[in-house]
Amino acid sequence: MVFKMSEMDIIKETYEKIKNMEIRGAGRIGRAAAKALKEYALKISHLNEEEFKNKMREAGNILISARPTAVSLPNVVKYVLKGLNEENPKERVIERADEFINSSLKAIENIGKFGANRIKDGDTILTHCNSEAAISVIKTAYDEGKDIKVFCTETRPRNQGYLTAKTLYDYGIDVTLIVDSAVRYFIKEIDIVVVGADAITANGCLVNKIGTSQIALIANESRVPFLTAAETYKFHPKTIVGELIEIEERSPEEVAVFEDKYKGIKIRNPAFDVTPAKYIDAIITEVGLIPPQGAWYIIEKYFGWLEK
């Protein structure tokens, strides 16, 4: 993607960081997009209203294209840019960006409180990847004085689980890091699974880091509760009318780089998979716990502002 305007630098920088996973996690991605739109709006506020709107929409489309699976991106961009249709659009876009950032941080806090209610003293928790929301649940349970242990999967190929393990260890929590393929071996030691979410569909399916669906299947087989922590802006409104979520496939070089002799070996690297609703015990949102079958209600209630 080619960027020509110096004023577009903040959009370019944010796009590249999201695309290259320097900024990772749906919540962080959403806040980064809102912040970039705010800064860009301030830079181009000297333009007339029509030019301002066109430039903001262009910037929004660029950001959305960075990660096709992360529904937080289009939802956040649409939320912020809805200000273009209101009185004083320049001011409203900036205000709506701030509103989203503040509400997103508050959502993480509330998810922690609701989710911690499902964690019992003495529980061993399994988590996957590097989710702010899931980490908030675990930290809150620990802050409540519960004696807990956490197993983190390494989360190949980018090893985001290392980040989670370090974060929880620094917080004082007992942490064990395991390879992704060892989940079934250790499931007998696990009391509850808590993961994050990149998207929730209208029928309650979970789109999350590759490997999540296998963990859910193993947990279901072993009768271990499987919960996903998801802010309401991660619910995908267009799935209610049958739109499918595109699963991003990333560079094969993230997995392995072979010498020339083996260049013919194909490598597939999907970043996400889909966990069916039947394997999910509850979705932890900032408004409370809901069954996966209630996802359509969240979309209907909280996405009235998402217009085509």
From Swiss-Prot:
> What Gene3D superfamilies does this protein map onto?
translation initiation factor eif-2b, domain 1, Translation initiation factor eif-2b, domain 2
* One Pfam family cited in the UniProt record for this chain: IF-2B
In this chain, substrate is annotated as bound at R24, G25, A26, G27, R67, N208, K209, K234
For this protein, the record's SUPFAM superfamilies field holds: NagB/RpiA/CoA transferase-like
Query: What positions constitute the catalytic site?
Result: C129, D198
- Keywords, sorted A to Z: Carbohydrate metabolism, Isomerase
- Give the GO terms filed under biological process for this record: L-methionine salvage from methylthioadenosine; pentose catabolic process
Catalytic activity, EC: 5.3.1.29
Reaction(s) catalyzed by this protein?
A: alpha-D-ribose 1,5-bisphosphate = D-ribulose 1,5-bisphosphate
Its function, per the record, reads: Catalyzes the isomerization of ribose 1,5-bisphosphate (R15P) to ribulose 1,5-bisphosphate (RuBP), the CO(2) acceptor and substrate for RubisCO. Functions in an archaeal AMP degradation pathway, together with AMP phosphorylase and RubisCO.
Q: What does the further note read?
A: Reaction proceeds via a cis-phosphoenolate intermediate.
Q: Which family does it belong to?
A: Belongs to the eIF-2B alpha/beta/delta subunits family. R15P isomerase subfamily.
The protein depicted here goes by the name Ribose 1,5-bisphosphate isomerase
